[in-house]
Amino acid sequence: TFQTASYAELIDHPVETGIIEFLDFEAQGIPHRIALSGIYPDFDRTRFLADIQKICETELAMFPSPAPFTEYLFLLHLGDNLYGGLEHISSTALLADRHSLPSYDMGEADKAYTELLGLFSHEYFHAWNVKSIKPAVFAPYNLDQENYTEQLWAFEGITSYYDDLFLARSKTISPEAYLTLLAQSITRVQQTQGRLKQTLAQSSFSAWDKFYKQDENSPNAIVSYYQKGALAALCLDLIIREKSQGKYTLDSVMQQHYRDWCNTHQGIPEKHWQIRCQEITGLDLETFFQTALYSTEDLPLAECLQSVGVKLDFIPLPRQHGGAFASEPQSVAPANDLGARFKQSSDHAVLT
């Protein structure tokens, strides 16, 4: 017999039956379990557990105690051509391709495994950012109708910024691999003409009827609050670091938002995320927010990255290239598409 305190609590706990393999570990003393189901080959369970544990430890260390859960469950269903996830307060339901698990002879994480680690990182971060910190219109959720907010950039976009960043912070991927992921994100957004038609605030608000009802013209008409939201979060983080001379970061803002949630259990009203960010840091960020959220101007990526010694170049590359990190400039044949590539302006890159 299973019992919950409310209907809301019931639907926040996914259920799966079948043949399931359990892998257990602890992160900061909190029990975690990965439940694998579906069809998948043998894989390096030791490495997989160690990598997920490092990611969880790193995310837990960023936020003040207590964590929003006393135990955590990853439900991972594996098959062919699967990818996705849905967050819950103390668990997540994930779908992934069976070939994304690490093989015994894998050295540096390959593309498929990196994407899998990023999926774990993304949905785990949602325990703080969405399931705890959330828009006021989601507290509580109204399940009888759509809930509209301009703030999805702050909840999905910021989470998308941190998901890959935590792979670098936890050292499950190299700084160079992280910069390649970042270059690919920039390339995807720049190749979307919809960024010149729709603002981030509009993208967030119209998610119900545009982002989740896409057609063949969508790339020309809309921009992703996940992808562009992640780049806006990157710029915001770097601007805060530079303007405060390192006293504050986006981490500082997220930590205080979580404290606010723990103290009040109230959601964030529209536009108040930006107000609270400026209160926490003591910085005037209105010009940035106006540009990033309410205009279709391109984000100041090159200027922001230059502040931490990273140079952003746009060069002709085949579409399948997608963007990359380069320690030295490389000559490439002209192509019809622009791709983003990074090069270091010093002899090393350090991400913290």
Predicted regions mapped to residue ranges:
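Non-catalytic architectural context of zinc metalloproteases
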Residues: 1-69, 82, 99, 103
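Active-site-adjacent bridging/hinge elements
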Residues: 26-33, 84-86, 91-95, 128-139, ...
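Alpha-helix capping and helix-loop boundary segments enriched in small/acidic/polar residues
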Residues: 43-47, 81-85, 104-115, 146-154, ...
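Active-site-proximal alpha-helical
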Residues: 59, 152-298
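Short, solvent-exposed turn/loop segments enriched in Gly/Ser/Thr/Pro and often Arg
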Residues: 70-82, 131-133, 182
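Catalytic zinc-binding patch centered on the HExxH motif and its immediate surroundings
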Residues: 79-104, 340
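Zinc-dependent metallopeptidase catalytic helix centered on the HExxH motif
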Residues: 93-194
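Beta/coil-rich, acidic/histidine-enriched accessory regions frequently appended to metallopeptidases
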Residues: 263-352
